[in-house]
């Protein structure tokens, strides 16, 4: 009885061994990408562990080229191909953070741009520029020019500034201050009317247009204009008849005829406003 069981167990064991070898061969053929563990696999895992260890020490260090190890499966060999994974070129251009020095603040230029403003009691206050000190020669030349005219045109101001060796702005400011001072002195009565400069007969600091308006006509032209105005007024008063005589047409024609003949302009004006009355036979006889 035991011999029968032993023979059955031996048969089952012999049948199981080919089937297991068949299954192992079939599985290896189904997945050819999974190579059999060889000595190269052990070296691959060893190199990978060493690279991981180096990467933990220097995360951005130089990485060597990674080479894929091929293996022959069922007599088919795969060519090896290397991949360059070095990141040293891309990270070398970026330096460590915070090492580059920041550009210095140009406080000197800011002080030069705004030298006239400073803080006084917590409030900004402009510092006045130093006053221009003129020499005696410059003051005498400016005063002489001010006696001639109180206002300077742009070419005159440029010429005066060039002759005195000052800027045009300084000449303009000096004339402004001098006009203001002269106006105050004239209002207070410190300056008599005979010492007024030329062009300021009516009031000090008058504009050039107002001062030159009185120079357009000479004294003889003013006198002639006044006599013409008085003659015109007298002629108008003489030519106007009384209300009593205005009813008669013969008085108007006889009285106004000599005057109208002497002045043709007045004759045209008179004929335009007062046409001559028709002469009838009753007035002649």
UniProtKB/Swiss-Prot annotation:
Coarse class of the protein's main subcellular location: nucleus
Domain of life assignment: Eukaryota
Lipid metabolism recorded as keyword: no
One Pfam short name: Homeodomain
PANTHER family hit by this protein: HOMEOBOX PROTEIN (PTHR24327), HOMEOBOX PROTEIN DLX-2 (PTHR24327:SF23)
DNA-binding region: 127-186
Stretch list, region Disordered: 17-47, 96-115, 188-238
Keyword tags: Angiogenesis, Developmental protein, Differentiation, DNA-binding, Homeobox, Neurogenesis, Nucleus, Sensory transduction, Vision
Family of the protein in this entry: Belongs to the distal-less homeobox family.
Tissue: Expression restricted to anterior ectodermal derivatives, namely the ventral forebrain, the cranial neural crest and the cement gland. Also expressed in the developing eye.
Compartment(s): Nucleus
Name of the protein this chain belongs to: Homeobox protein DLL-4
Key word Hydrolase present: no
A GO molecular-function descriptor: RNA polymerase II cis-regulatory region sequence-specific DNA binding
Organism: Xenopus laevis (African clawed frog)
Biased composition (Low complexity): 200-214
GO biological process: one example: negative regulation of transcription by RNA polymerase II
């Amino acid at each position: 009885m035991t011999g029968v069981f032993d023979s059955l167990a031996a048969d089952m064991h012999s049948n199981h061994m080919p089937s297991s070898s068949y299954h192992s061969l079939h599985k290896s053929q189904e997945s050819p990408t999974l190579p059999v563990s060889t000595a190269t696999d052990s070296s691959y895992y060893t190199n990978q562990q060493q690279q991981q260890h180096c990467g933990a020490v220097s995360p951005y260090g130089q990485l060597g080229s990674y080479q894929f190890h091929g293996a022959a499966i069922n007599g088919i060999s795969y060519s090896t191909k290397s991949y360059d994974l070095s990141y040293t070129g891309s990270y070398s251009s970026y330096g460590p953070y915070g090492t580059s020095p920041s550009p210095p603040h140009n406080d000197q230029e800011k002080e030069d741009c705004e030298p006239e403003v400073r803080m006084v009691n917590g409030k900004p206050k402009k510092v006045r520029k130093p006053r221009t000190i003129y020499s005696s020669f410059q003051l005498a030349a400016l005063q002489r020019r001010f006696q001639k005219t109180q206002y300077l045109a742009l070419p005159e101001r440029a010429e005066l500034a060039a002759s005195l060796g000052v800027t045009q702005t300084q000449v303009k400011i000096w004339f402004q201050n001098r006009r203001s001072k002269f106006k105050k002195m004239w209002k207070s009565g410190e300056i008599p009317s005979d010492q007024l400069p030329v062009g300021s007969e009516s009031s000090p600091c008058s504009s050039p247009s107002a001062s030159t308006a009185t120079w357009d006509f000479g004294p003889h032209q003013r006198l002639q204009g006044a006599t013409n105005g008085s003659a015109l007024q007298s002629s108008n008063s003489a030519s106007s008849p009384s209300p009593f005589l205005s009813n008669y047409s013969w008085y108007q024609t006889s009285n106004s005829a000599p005057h109208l003949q002497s002045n043709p302009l007045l004759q045209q004006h008179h004929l335009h406003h007062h046409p001559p009355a028709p002469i009838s036979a009753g007035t002649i006889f």
